[in-house]
């Protein structure tokens, strides 16, 4: 870890709130933020940058190491929703890089979030951050161009995913008009019903606003 890294830097936190643009790494395997577990702090963190050049350099390093990633630009108007979505993914920290300086910021230090069991209208709030996070790690590893056979970590993730799935509550989609259930076709033979870990994942699927969620 870089010697310049520090924790809870207020200047960095302020910039994360006010910069006109930021950049983040996105996994080429999941199309979601690239997440890593810090070996010293065990933070589940994403990588963010104040400049496109720094983001591109880091992406190049990882791609050369066989880890497929890209970069995404975040405009100021997108940032609050982006930060909030990290909670539903089980991500708790941001590793912010600028030149040779790295600053680890805890998500809860600048995006506070109350998560009641029910919303004001009495509807159950469905989220599965542990499942979402484990699935991200699993897919980042198993969809790499070269996967280490017999990796015990992969089996551990599979077991955790099965456990979280059996205990969780999920969102299904039905058509607003009628009760039709949308399905996802992977090929001519495999057809699946789509279910979602949380409302944000449901909204990604419901871009035309023709569906309603049920738990």
Annotate the PLM regions:
Residues 1-215:
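An interfacial alpha-helical scaffold signature
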């Amino acid at each position: 870890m870089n010697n310049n890294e520090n924790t809870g830097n207020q200047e960095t936190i302020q910039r994360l709130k006010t910069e006109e643009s930021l950049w983040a790494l996105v996994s080429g395997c999941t199309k979601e933020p690239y997440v890593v577990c810090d070996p010293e702090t065990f933070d589940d963190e994403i990588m963010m940058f104040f400049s496109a050049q720094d983001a591109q350099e880091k992406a190049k390093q990882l791609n050369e190491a066989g880890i497929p990633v890209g970069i995404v630009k975040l405009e100021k108007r997108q940032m609050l929703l982006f930060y909030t979505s990290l909670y539903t993914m089980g991500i708790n920290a941001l590793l912010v890089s600028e030149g040779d300086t790295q600053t680890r910021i805890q998500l809860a230090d600048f995006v506070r979030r109350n998560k009641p069991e029910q919303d004001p209208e009495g509807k159950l709030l469905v989220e599965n951050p542990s499942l979402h996070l484990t699935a991200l790690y699993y897919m980042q590893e198993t969809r790499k161009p070269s996967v280490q056979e017999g990796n015990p970590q992969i089996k551990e993730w599979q077991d955790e995913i099965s456990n979280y799935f059996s205990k969780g509550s999920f969102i299904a989609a039905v058509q607003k008009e009628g009760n039709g259930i949308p399905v996802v076709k992977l090929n001519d033979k495999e057809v699946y019903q789509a279910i979602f870990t949380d409302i944000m994942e449901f909204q990604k699927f419901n871009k035309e606003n023709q569906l309603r969620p049920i738990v």
